[in-house]
């Protein structure tokens, strides 16, 4: 049995990012529903109400797979009245290769977009490309990650053909094992970041994150943790050097029903208010 492939560039540091991101829904009420028809069509719908702006956003998508041909068709719609279609073929052109054609259309404005995405991964390398199909000139994204004995090295570049210049030049280095991840990155030579993930025990996951920019004294540093109370409940907590505190509680009420409660507290201005709470309910078969 071969080793697992390296992560794609966008997924570097994902385990640490999940410690800081999953289990929190500050300032919103959210409902997600997933169902599957007898014919195999998967439906996903969601609605989010922003407490501050009062805006309600909803989305609906359907996904159908033709497994014999490696094809997946996805249709999407949202309350901004944007329609989207994705067609994906995987492992048929070549083993490990996935190609997706995406298109969006906004009827009220007539705006159309198209993207051609591809990704390939084996035990040593993970490569993905993203071409924005703009008639005025495509924007091309290319990223690659190499893996050697747990060590990771990645690069991401974006070329804007309309302006005939590179818009992004990013690099990342890291190391990962099953229960430990180290990630560092440099974006455009001026923005720096790093994260550490450690699975301390079967119940406790911890993360550390740091970001700063050249020429700026403003550094963002945070620590976070997830603790599993049991198989169906978990606690989440995080804090950064600006005294912003995040707390979350996630409970599986019954199979297919998960409730998440979260709160964001401004520790520097505790008495001034402005704290945020959030509630999310996920339903799936």
What name fits each language-model region?
Residues 37-39, 66-68, 79, 91-95, ...:
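Outer-membrane beta-barrel strand-turn architecture
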Residues 60, 85-87, 116-118, 142, ...:
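Membrane-embedded beta-strands of outer-membrane beta-barrel proteins
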């Amino acid at each position: 049995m071969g080793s697992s492939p390296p992560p794609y560039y966008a997924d570097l540091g994902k385990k640490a990012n999940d410690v800081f991101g999953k289990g929190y829904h500050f300032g919103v009420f959210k409902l997600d529903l997933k169902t599957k028809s007898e014919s195999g069509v998967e439906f996903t719908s969601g609605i989010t109400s922003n407490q501050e702006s009062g805006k309600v956003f909803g989305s609906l998508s359907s996904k159908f797979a033709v497994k014999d041909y490696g094809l997946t068709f996805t249709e999407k719609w949202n309350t901004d009245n944007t329609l989207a279609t994705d067609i994906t073929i995987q492992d048929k052109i070549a083993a490990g290769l996935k190609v997706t054609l995406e298109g969006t259309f906004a009827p009220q404005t007539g705006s159309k977009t198209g993207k051609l995405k591809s990704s390939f991964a084996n035990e040593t390398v993970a490569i993905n490309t993203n071409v924005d199909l703009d008639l005025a000139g495509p924007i091309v994204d290319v990223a690659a990650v190499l893996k050697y004995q747990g060590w990771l090295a990645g690069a991401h570049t974006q070329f804007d053909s309309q302006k005939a210049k590179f818009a992004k030049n990013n690099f990342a280095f890291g190391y990962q094992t099953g229960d430990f991840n180290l990630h560092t990155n440099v974006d455009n030579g001026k923005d720096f970041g790093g994260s550490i993930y450690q699975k301390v025990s079967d119940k406790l996951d911890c993360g550390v994150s740091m970001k700063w920019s050249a020429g700026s004294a403003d550094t963002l540093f945070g620590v976070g943790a997830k603790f599993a109370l049991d198989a169906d409940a978990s606690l989440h907590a995080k804090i950064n050097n600006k005294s912003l505190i995040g707390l979350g509680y996630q409970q599986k009420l019954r199979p297919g029903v998960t409730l998440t409660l979260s709160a964001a507290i401004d520790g520097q201005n505790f008495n001034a208010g402005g704290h945020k709470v959030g509630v999310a309910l996920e339903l799936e078969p």
